């Protein structure tokens, strides 16, 4: 199953919102809160691997780091 547009939009929005000029960092719980407005649950997103966006962003010129576990985990994006 491909990643829904709503999930990509959530990541794009959070990257822009948290951009400090060099990188953007935010918690997985921020993504979950954003996609909840599209009726996508945390369980559904995790079960379907919809938060595994790293390859998409790496293919589009970003570096991506994912640290931690669960809702406290943090994504960091930067221009590679």
Question: Model-derived features: where do they sit?
Answer:
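Short amphipathic alpha-helical interaction segments
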Residues: 46-55
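An N-terminal amphipathic alpha-helical segment
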Residues: 1-43
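C-terminal edge-of-domain segments
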Residues: 56, 61-80
């Amino acid at each position: 199953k491909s990643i829904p547009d709503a999930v990509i939009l959530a990541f794009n929005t959070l990257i822009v919102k948290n951009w400090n000029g060099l990188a953007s960092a935010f918690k997985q719980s921020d993504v979950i809160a954003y996609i909840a407005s599209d009726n996508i649950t945390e369980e559904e997103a995790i079960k379907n691997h919809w938060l595994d966006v790293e390859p998409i962003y790496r293919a589009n010129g970003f570096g991506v780091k994912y640290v931690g576990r669960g809702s406290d985990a943090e994504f960091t994006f930067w221009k590679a």
